[in-house]
C-alpha cells in the first residue's frame, strides 16, 4: 500500500520493543499498512530492528519506515535494518544520495516552495510539510497552485477530527502523518490497544469519506 492509497501514516516511538509490537499490531488490525517509527531515543535502532522483524513475520503487508532522521549515516543504518522509507525534518542532500542509491523512498521536511522544488530536483516523490501547525492547509493550497504535481504530507498540526482532516485533504495533501493525536500517551500508559485499533479504523474511514 502506498502513502497515497493509505492517506495516513501513524508516527510512533517508544523504547520498549514489546509495547511497540502491540502498538504496531493495533494499527495493523485497525487497517493501517504503513507506520513511521520516529528515531528519537538511545538505542532506537535496536527497537526498530525488533519491530521490523516482528512485522515481517507476523503482519503481512505492513510497511515500516523511520522518521526524525537528520544525517546520511542514520539513514544508512536504518536502511540496513530494513527501513522501507526515510522521513526527515530537514532537507539534506546527503540523505537524498544514500536513499536514491538504495532506491528507498525519502521524504524531507520542507518549509518553502524553494525547498520543495530542490527536494523534487533531488528525486523526492513526496515532501513532508513540517511543522504542519505552522503552515496550515492554506500553505498547501498555495503550493499546489503553481505546482499541482507536488505531493505533500503534513505532520504536526494534524488531528483525528473530521474538520481538521477535511481542511488538509481539501487543500490537496496526499496523506497525513499522525503522532500523539492518534497514538496518545494515555493509550500507551493504559495499554488500551483496543481503543487504538478503533481510532485507527475510524480515522482511515474519515479520510476515505473526506476524499470521496
What are these regions (language model features)?
Residues 19, 47, 73-74, 94-95, ...:
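Short acidic active-site motifs
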Residues 85-95, 129-136, 172-192:
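Glycine-rich phosphate-binding active-site loops on the catalytic face of alpha/beta enzymes
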Residues 28-33, 79-86, 101-107, 121-126, ...:
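Glycine-enriched alpha-helix->loop->beta-strand junction motifs that scaffold or abut catalytic
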Residues 92-135:
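Histidine/lysine/aspartate-rich catalytic loop segments that bind and position anionic ligands
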Residues 71-81, 114-122, 159-176:
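Catalytic cores of alpha/beta
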Residues 7-12, 35-37, 64-67, 86-87, ...:
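Hydrophobic faces of well-ordered beta-strands that scaffold small-molecule active sites
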Amino acid at each position: 500500500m502506498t502513502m497515497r492509497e493509505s492517506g495516513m501514516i501513524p508516527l510512533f516511538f517508544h523504547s520498549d520493543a514489546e509495547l511497540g509490537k502491540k502498538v504496531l499490531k493495533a494499527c495493523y488490525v485497525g487497517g493501517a499498512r504503513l507506520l513511521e517509527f520516529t528515531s528519537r531515543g538511545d538505542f532506537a535502532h535496536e527497537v526498530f530492528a525488533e519491530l521490523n522483524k516482528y512485522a515481517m513475520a507476523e503482519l503481512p503487508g505492513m510497511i515500516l519506515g523511520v522518521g526524525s532522521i537528520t544525517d546520511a549515516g542514520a539513514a544508512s543504518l536504518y536502511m540496513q535494518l530494513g527501513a522501507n522509507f526515510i522521513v526527515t525534518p530537514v532537507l539534506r542532500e546527503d540523505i537524498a544520495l544514500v536513499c536514491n542509491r538504495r532506491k528507498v523512498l525519502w521524504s524531507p521536511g520542507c518549509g518553502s516552495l524553494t525547498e520543495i522544488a530542490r527536494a523534487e530536483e533531488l528525486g523526492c516523490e513526496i515532501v513532508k510539510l513540517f511543522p504542519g501547525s505552522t503552515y496550515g492547509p492554506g500553505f498547501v493550497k498555495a503550493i499546489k497552485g503553481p505546482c499541482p504535481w507536488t505531493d505533500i504530507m503534513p505532520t504536526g498540526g494534524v488531528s483525528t477530527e473530521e474538520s481538521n482532516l477535511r481542511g488538509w485533504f481539501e487543500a490537496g495533501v496526499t496523506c497525513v502523518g499522525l503522532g500523539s493525536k492518534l497514538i496518545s500517551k494515555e493509550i500507551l500508559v493504559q495499554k488500551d490497544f483496543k481503543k487504538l485499533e478503533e481510532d485507527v479504523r475510524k480515522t482511515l474511514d474519515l479520510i476515505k469519506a473526506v476524499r470521496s
